[in-house]
């Protein structure tokens, strides 16, 4: 059995988890999230915890039990604490400005780039060169951060561009004459 799939998911107070036919819903202070249940995994709830068992002895069911467990755990953490990703802008004149549900980027193009935020995602700019993306859905927060980074990825010679705050850019040496 999967090592991660063996561990139960603790459900804290203030979080409601409903396991219906083929859907798991988690509701809390941070919102509500839904996940389609996989047929290879049996989900059972007991005394403030959720446990996941493979439906059969196949490798796929074993692997999927760990995957389902972690996805539901991310949902529980998301509706209680939430997730955030930080991005930094490196470059002369590069700046970001949050305007409600929009992000306005000036990153070296001849025009400003506007990015709309999906529902459930908030964006903040504590400084003009820093972007903080927050939300309850871990996958969506990471996806939005990756889309913003793709607007101007860091280039390898000077390191200019949009990067994750914990990302290390290896700077290449220029060609010697």
Curated annotation (Swiss-Prot):
Keywords: Ribonucleoprotein, Ribosomal protein, RNA-binding, rRNA-binding. InterPro entries: Ribosomal_uL6-like (IPR000702), Ribosomal_uL6-like_a/b-dom_sf (IPR036789), Ribosomal_uL6_a/b-dom (IPR020040), Ribosomal_uL6_bac-type (IPR019906), Ribosomal_uL6_CS (IPR002358). The keyword rRNA-binding applies. The gene is rplF. NCBIfam families: L6_bact (TIGR03654). It comes from the Bacteria. Part of the 50S ribosomal subunit. It comes from Albidiferax ferrireducens (strain ATCC BAA-621 / DSM 15236 / T118) (Rhodoferax ferrireducens). This is Large ribosomal subunit protein uL6. Disulfide bonds: none annotated. GO terms for biological process: cytoplasmic translation. PROSITE patterns: RIBOSOMAL_L6_1. One of its GO terms (molecular function) is rRNA binding. This protein binds to the 23S rRNA, and is important in its secondary structure. It is located near the subunit interface in the base of the L7/L12 stalk, and near the tRNA binding site of the peptidyltransferase center. GO terms for cellular component: cytosolic large ribosomal subunit. Belongs to the universal ribosomal protein uL6 family.
